[in-house]
């Protein structure tokens, strides 16, 4: 997962607190602040604080300072970081060496005359190490370049914003860098039938979804159906663009990092994956999960000779995504209708993808 921090800017404390507010409002994961301002920042909101103080969440020292400080911080349960200005080859060597110490979590790299080459060298030297590499930049364009260097890119970026309006753009960039791109395909409906009543799950998120977005749900791990959000206007009930009426309690849902959960296990505060018809994804936070007894509908579909199934509520407002990329109500499904799915060759064990033969039917 890519992450980003903002380094507070301003000539006085009041200006710096304004940049803290901007970071909080933009959901930036962390802030690099002066140690004298840690308590003031904590009063404004809950955010990871990086500073040269044992009161910070990430204890930071500069190159040349006593590494024993970080050892002590690590023993007390803190994360640790070393800040290195890259001006010479010796600085590169130091950054690489300090990154291999088991009590250092982050190496933060800043270049006074920045080029990509030193960063490429350090990323290559540290390939396979557990250290998180963080680059310091002054604009979103350079942040994007840092995230993509040598395809792997840095793990994080510290933005020192020259324009405060870039903070929101930086937040959007972090979200985009963490979005997974999934390969979706079409399966052909072979059977639709009512199966009686059961406990079905509605997922109410903290995000507004758009037309073409929903969540991947299914009875089988090898093929999940794109269940559309309640964004479609209809004459019976108001739209609920934050909601996916997902299916019964037993069904799988695809979550971030290619993990699955049972719908019955979801709760407020969990993160789920919102997926659009093109396979583009974003994370969303669950605000509420509702489990209610409702009439259910079995949907079977064939994909590459395999039979896939899911069960959905039998209601006009429940939709899959059809061949034209538009939502199609379950009551309008027919044998031969094409619907979007995500095929998967892997089985699942506690939500993790594994190579194992499992029969699901």
From Swiss-Prot:
Broad EC category: oxidoreductase
Alphabetically ordered keywords of this record: Amino-acid biosynthesis, Aromatic amino acid biosynthesis, NAD, Oxidoreductase
GO function terms (MF aspect): 3-dehydroquinate synthase activity; dehydroquinate synthase activity; NAD binding
Catalytic reactions on record: 2-amino-2,3,7-trideoxy-D-lyxo-hept-6-ulosonate + NAD(+) + H2O = 3-dehydroquinate + NH4(+) + NADH + H(+)
Domain of life: Archaea
Keyword field contains Amino-acid biosynthesis: yes
UniProt keyword NAD, yes or no: yes
Pfam families assigned to the protein according to its UniProt record, in alphabetical order: DHQS (PF01959)
Enzyme Commission code(s) on record: 1.4.1.24
Biological process according to GO: amino acid biosynthetic process; aromatic amino acid family biosynthetic process
NCBIfam families per the UniProt record, alphabetical: PRK02290.1-2, PRK02290.1-5
Family as reported in the entry's similarity comment: Belongs to the archaeal-type DHQ synthase family.
Purpose: Catalyzes the oxidative deamination and cyclization of 2-amino-3,7-dideoxy-D-threo-hept-6-ulosonic acid (ADH) to yield 3-dehydroquinate (DHQ), which is fed into the canonical shikimic pathway of aromatic amino acid biosynthesis.
Protein known as: 3-dehydroquinate synthase
Species annotation: Methanococcus maripaludis (strain C5 / ATCC BAA-1333)
């Amino acid at each position: 997962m890519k992450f980003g921090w903002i380094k507070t800017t301003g000539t006085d404390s009041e200006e710096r607190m304004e940049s803290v507010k901007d970071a909080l409002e933009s959901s930036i994961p962390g802030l690099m602040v002066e140690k004298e301002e840690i308590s003031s920042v904590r009063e404004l909101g809950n955010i990871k604080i990086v500073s040269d103080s044992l009161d910070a969440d990430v204890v930071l020292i500069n190159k040349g300072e006593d590494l024993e400080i970080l050892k002590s911080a690590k023993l007390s349960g803190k994360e640790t970081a070393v800040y290195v200005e890259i001006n010479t080859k010796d600085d590169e060597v130091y950054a690489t060496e300090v990154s291999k110490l088991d009590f250092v979590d982050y190496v933060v790299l800043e270049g006074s005359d920045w080029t990509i080459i030193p960063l490429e060298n350090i990323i290559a030297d540290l390939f396979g190490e557990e250290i998180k590499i963080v680059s310091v930049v002054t604009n979103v364009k350079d942040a994007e370049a840092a995230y993509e260097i040598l395809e792997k890119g840095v793990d994080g970026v510290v933005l020192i914003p020259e324009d405060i309006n870039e903070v929101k753009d930086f937040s959007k960039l972090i979200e985009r860098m963490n979005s997974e791109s999934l390969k979706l395909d079409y399966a052909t409906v072979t059977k639709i039938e009512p199966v009686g009543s059961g406990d079905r799950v509605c997922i109410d998120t903290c995000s507004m979804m758009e037309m073409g977005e929903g969540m991947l749900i299914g009875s089988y791990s090898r093929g999940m159906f794109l269940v559309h959000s309640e964004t479609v206007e209809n004459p019976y009930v108001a739209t609920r663009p934050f909601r996916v009426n997902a299916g019964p309690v037993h069904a799988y849902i695809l979550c971030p990092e290619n993990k699955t959960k049972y719908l019955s296990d979801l709760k407020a505060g969990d993160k789920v994956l919102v997926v659009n018809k093109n396979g583009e994804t974003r994370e969303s936070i669950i605000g509420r999960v509702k489990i209610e007894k409702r009439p259910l509908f079995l949907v079977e579909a064939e994909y590459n000779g395999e039979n896939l199934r899911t069960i959905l509520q039998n209601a006009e407002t429940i939709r899959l995504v059809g061949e034209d990329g538009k939502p199609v109500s379950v009551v309008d499904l027919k044998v031969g209708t094409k619907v979007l799915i995500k095929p998967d060759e892997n089985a699942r064990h506690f939500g993790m993808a594994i190579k194992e033969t499992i029969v699901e039917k």
